[in-house]
Amino acid sequence: MNQTRKVLVLADSDNTRIAAQSFNRKMDWEKLRNYLANPEEGRELIEMVIYVGMPPAKERFVEQRKFTEKFSYWAKSNGFMVVEQEGKAKGNEYQADVDVVMAMDAIELSLEIKPDIVVLVTGDSDFAHLAQKLRRRGIRVEVASVEQSLGKDLKNSANSVIDLISIFDEFRSKNGRKEHFRIGHTNVFD
């Protein structure tokens, strides 16, 4: 009999949303959660944390902030743990670095809840050292991303890579049409 493995999922919302949009898909967080912690594969989801960069509370970001607040509320209402990081204005854009917060939480939560697997939903190579650190503690690290946004250092630091192209194909198209955008084949990361 297979033993159930405890899974902790940590997702960079902006990185993941942009990856889905690059395939003309609307992000479906519930499908993603079910895909990454499938109980039929002997996985038990302990927690899924979504890291959200909040637009600054300034007049020029009002609409973006409302949209992001609405998403955060939805995610919390649907069983996700949400960590919001206030952004800083940089001209007409803003930057809300969730990387440091996500990395610190990954270490802290891993020490506290002792997952068997940590899934990092990001392609950002800034998380390569985190992946190595978790692996040194005996935790399996999986990176969920698409090839186009997966940094080489992160790919090489993880135990394995989960190709999100197949799950993105199940998401609703942003324009409502049924389109499929497969790049390569199912073993694109091998």
Question: Which ranges hold each PLM region?
Answer:
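Domain-level signal for Mg2+-assisted phosphodiester chemistry and nucleotide/NA-binding surfaces
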Residues: 1-97, 140, 149
